[in-house]
Amino acid sequence: LQSKMAYTAQITRNTPTAFLFLVDHSISMQKMTSLFGEEMTMAEAAARIVNRQINELVYRCIKSNETRHYYDIAVIGYGERAYSGWNGDLEGRDFVSPEELREHPYKKIITREEKRTRKGVVVKEVEKVQWVEAQHDGSWTHLHEAFSKAQQLLNQWMEKHHDKDCYPPTIINITDGEFNGATRESLLQQANELKSMFTNDGNVILFNIHFTASKSAAEVVCPIEISELRGNSYAETLFNMSSLLPERYNADISR
């Protein structure tokens, strides 16, 4: 790595970055959870989170009605195997551009979202574009297969951008944490291998979003200590897989 401060590269068309969403499609994701005060399956909540983030990424690329190629975006669904998670015209694709996403929406739905107003936070109904459908039909939760596919895609992406000062790719894994088919130790090793990949601007970032069906469990955001997870073994494993949040973001998170 270069000696300059990491995670400071400007994201441009010449120096893009990448986002990979890994989405648990196993049958255990049919359990119920809550998102913005609305009861739904974990699979539906995962799909809404991914679609919402993609909406935001695409919106940030629109300049004077031109959709600029700031990011490459991939969705990997996983159950017994790992596969492209796109629906509609993009089905079967791996990385796609913001322009392709803007031109090929899957469908539109009405969702409830928190909006900040002068009177505080309110929940409003909004129309949102979807590219990813909720799924919970996998008999297994082979996270190791998703990690392997993510590494394959990132190897290809890094080869294409290795000589550029690109902000490192970000991996976001969304799951209830009930993985099987591989040991905890081997999954931690795979996670470490992903996090050891790097661009000139820093190492790949791996985040995990963990769903629980427990209505009594309080939401934990960006835990600093493993003790904050109150002994939930699935959450603890995901915590140990995750990247440390880059220091430059600490001030934003603490607000």
Predicted regions and their residues:
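Acidic, low-complexity intrinsically disordered regions
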Residues: 1-255
